[in-house]
């Protein structure tokens, strides 16, 4: 924070360091909120992608006949 105190010694309109610190704290708070929201969106998106990958990859690894038999038995349940 020392850099900001040096900056406000010349002071835009004589604002105190508390005003600067309050502004900085608000910006930091906003950034943390945005990052958290972004992380949640990424987590949701990656979960969706992984779910789709799981569904599409598993049948391709099996021969067509067994994949058809498995999907039929799933519908019967």
UniProtKB/Swiss-Prot annotation:
Residues 65-77 have a biased composition (Low complexity). It comes from Frog virus 3 (isolate Goorha). Residues 56-77 are annotated as: Disordered. This is Uncharacterized protein 071R.
